[in-house]
């Protein structure tokens, strides 16, 4: 998910199917605050590979721009978005990242600006901080051409687009097939720098 400031509100861009579960989980951390956690059914995510609309996707500049607005008649984030995102090697959502099955750094969170090592406490901090400190992430989510797929490691396949999303051991990832933004991590350097 992505977080958006909206005046006094905070909007979270997440999969429609995951919104209910996310709202329930966030409610657990409300801690007696008088805040409302609710779904905004009328808003959908829109995107553009270029242009000035919305804001740059915080994960990777090449992903283009995103914004939240009412639906305009069709699927706002569609197969075009999926093809664009996978071509840049970025996995997202439950189908590709699982749900509570993978460690956060295995999902390339450090490389895609999804974690801060300077922030205080958060759920999962212990494992995430230890993996970063030890500079050891044994497995990674990678997007590879379907022709190079390892079915035993496959999390999602898109035959129409020619891509496979997989959870592979780092030594089994061919650097020639990985995106440039992941090269430093695969070369054995630190999985990320403070954001």
Model-found features: residue ranges?
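Basic, glycine/lysine-rich polyanion-binding surfaces/domains
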Residues: 1-195
């Amino acid at each position: 998910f992505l977080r958006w400031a909206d005046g006094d509100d905070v909007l979270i861009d997440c999969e429609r199917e995951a919104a209910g579960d996310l709202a329930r989980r966030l409610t657990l951390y409300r801690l007696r605050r008088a805040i409302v956690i609710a779904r905004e059914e009328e808003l959908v995510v829109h995107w553009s590979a270029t242009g000035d609309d919305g804001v740059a996707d915080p994960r990777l500049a090449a992903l283009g721009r995103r914004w939240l607005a009412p639906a305009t008649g069709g699927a706002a984030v569609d197969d075009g978005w999926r093809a664009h995102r996978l071509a840049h090697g970025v996995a997202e959502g439950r189908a590709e990242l699982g749900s509570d099955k993978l460690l956060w750094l295995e999902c390339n969170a450090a490389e895609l600006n999804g974690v801060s090592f300077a922030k205080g406490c958060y759920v999962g901090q212990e494992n995430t901080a230890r993996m970063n400190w030890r500079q050891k992430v044994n497995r990674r989510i990678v997007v590879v051409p379907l022709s190079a797929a390892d079915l035993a490691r496959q999390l999602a396949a898109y035959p129409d687009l020619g891509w496979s999303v997989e959870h592979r051991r780092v030594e089994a990832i061919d650097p020639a097939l990985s995106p440039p933004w992941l090269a430093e991590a695969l070369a054995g350097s630190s999985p990320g720098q403070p954001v």
